[in-house]
Amino acid sequence: MALLYPNTYPLAVSNLGFQLLYRLLNDSEEIVCERFVYPQEREPFRSLESSRPLVDFPLIFGSISFEQDYAHLAAMLVAGGVAPYAADRPGKIAAGSPLVVLGGVGVFMNPEPLALFADLMVIGEAEPVLPRLLPALAALTDRRELTEIGATIPGCYVPSAYSFRYDSDGRVREISVSEGLPQQVRRVALEQSDLAAHSEILSPEAELGMYMTELGRGCSRGCRFCAAGFIYRPPRLWSADAVLDGLGQRPPEVDRVGLLGMEMADPELLDSIAGFLQVFCRPMPVRSLFPHCGQTEFPLAYLNSSLILA
């Protein structure tokens, strides 16, 4: 299968969600996943792993993080020889007429702007959905069978099975749904993680040039200007074991660590992280970056240590 990131390689390899999805897909026995990124000028549009064209793949996943990348997604499908609109693809799923599955923050924040391009959309976080979705997709031969997935797997939205009627001012008046499908597709969220998401691929082209580890998802503050604080509900902080296990995957030659989260971890976890880095990252001193601390109280001792680069 092909995994698309509709922006350049430096942004793709810096995106922790894209890296996590790449690992989850390749961990599956049903899937061999190859990446595509939006090509820069005069770059060939081929998979990064084997240099195959997009049209060779019968299954395409797209990870959409930003609204500015919507046009890039359509351009990538056209450049790869794939009909951009789902309605223009034949019913039978095959190379040249692939099944297009879209997910990511941009999708579950508002799926409708991209619904015309997608045969299937994942509304929510990938980890709870993929264990059931991937075997179902592997057995799929025709797009008409997608309604069974939409009816049985939470978080799976089949746009072609829903039709909308609008008022004159553009508001939705009525939604008609195919038989057996839910009236509303509820967003799904991971309850707890045994292993915090972390960098799977390290590249000198990545932004900030660091090994990233996720502290949790969501934020309890609910600032009205922040979409992420609302779409990643409920707010969750990963356990110390999950975060330290994620940090433990760091290659020994990497000296820059990023701890990512919309809400800072509690002091006990920060103490554990600081102790872990001091013990397991010698003799090379590790520099850590907390890009967003909100208004969380931050102990002065961390700022006085060699562990923090703010």
List where the protein language model places each region:
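Conserved SAM/AdoMet-binding glycine-rich loop
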Residues: 3-4, 8, 244-310
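Canonical Radical SAM [4Fe-4S] cluster-binding loop centered on the CxxxCxxC motif
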Residues: 15, 205-239
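Short helix-loop-beta junction
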Residues: 20-32, 279-281
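Conserved, mostly hydrophobic/aromatic
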Residues: 25, 119, 219, 223, ...
